[in-house]
Amino acid sequence: RQMCIRDRRTNKLYQKIKEIVASGELGEIRRSQWMINSWWRPDSYYQQSAWRATWGGEGGGVLVNQAPHQLDLWQWICGIPVKVFSKNINGCHRNIGVENDVTMLVEFANGATGTFTTCTHDAIGTDRLEIDLDGGKIVVDNSKTAHVYHYIDKEGNPCTEDYLNEHMNMMEVAMLTSGNGAGSKLYTEETFENNDGWGFQHTTVMQNFAAHSKTGSPLLAPGEDGINGVNLANSSQLSAWTGREVSNPCDPEEYAAELNKLIEAEGKFPVRE
């Protein structure tokens, strides 16, 4: 049995969110967005080694180095996109030739949309995941605090956004948009915190693998899941290189051909077979 080191799956917040989404208590996902810019990297970082931030040595930039954990979590919770359109900027405010600024738009099998934005030139940084669902919304800030909102009707019973759309009159809408706090009558809110220290996630995912090997208990990050993040990163790159929407997974031969063009133009490493 194989595992992949996707240790962020041990974060209690993301486990709770996955449980809520998978349970269906908030209905289907309508859209999701993750802005993850909390890994500022100056030029000195990229100059540490000859392979860093190269097409031939590393295979790309932020999508293969910093963002893989979030690409994994996004798909683990929200599902695997079927279409990808991406605008990736190479060497954005940095003296490198690979992507370090990514804006990705995806579509899921149920028609839901999603965006994933990341860069390495934001020294302040943001880490915020939002998931809009039929029956509410989930917001995670800095991978430490999660707010889960449930829509409610006038009697305080759970309902959907469709129900609110059909039953709210214009007077109620006017009160809501006037900023008088009426919005709190539309939903309930739960807050969850995660204060696990650095290193906890790495040890936990390894302990999980050891327990699986010994007792057969379920893996948090089975090996076959590892390809999902690679596929999405590749689809994002191919879309950016060609300027068009691509399927996910993308055509591996077309991806390899386009990557080799960049490796050859870079002139630092041999092209890939």
Named regions from a protein language model:
Residues R1-I5:
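Short, small-residue-biased leader/transition segments that mark boundaries at the very start
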Residues R8-I96, G243:
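Predominantly a Rossmann-like dinucleotide-binding segment in NAD(P)-dependent oxidoreductases
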Residues P68, H93, T117-G125, G197-W198:
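Glycine-rich phosphate/pyrophosphate-binding beta-alpha loops
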Residues C78, M206-S217, N234-W241:
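Short, hydrophobic alpha-helical segments
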Residues T103, F108, G135-A221, V246, ...:
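C-terminal glycine/acidic-rich active-site capping loop/insertion
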Residues L219-Y255:
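A contiguous, mid-protein "functional segment" used to position or interact
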